[in-house]
């Protein structure tokens, strides 16, 4: 894909998806809010300074590629890294696997609904903030 003509936000989204990151997982790796990643991808703001360098490290590309899409700085194909789970994630997985399958399905459905509600809430808060900032 030709990335030179993409915006900074489009390059961030393109590379994030190539590496199979969600906005939340990228934000977690950068120790920032997922709203910041969303704003970058929409073009509402741009990463600067330390965030730009951290972003280039997580996205396995150069900062100049993020900013300008330079062909000679094209990112290399994604490298599959083994996933290391935190103690909390391991505990969650062990508890989940101890449940009967029907209860696993119920718990997954409930968690999906909670995440959906939180995402909706964050979007509403972001819209309210944008309306306030426009005044």
Swiss-Prot record:
Pfam families: HTH_3. Keywords: Cell cycle, Cell division, DNA-binding, Repressor, Transcription, Transcription regulation. InterPro entries: Cro/C1-type_HTH, Lambda_DNA-bd_dom_sf. Residues 23-42 bind DNA. GO terms for molecular function: DNA binding. Residues 12-66 form the HTH cro/C1-type domain. PROSITE patterns: HTH_CROC1. It comes from the Bacteria. This protein is a repressor of division inhibition gene dicB. This is HTH-type transcriptional regulator DicA. It comes from Escherichia coli (strain K12). The lineage of its organism: Bacteria, Pseudomonadati, Pseudomonadota, Gammaproteobacteria, Enterobacterales.
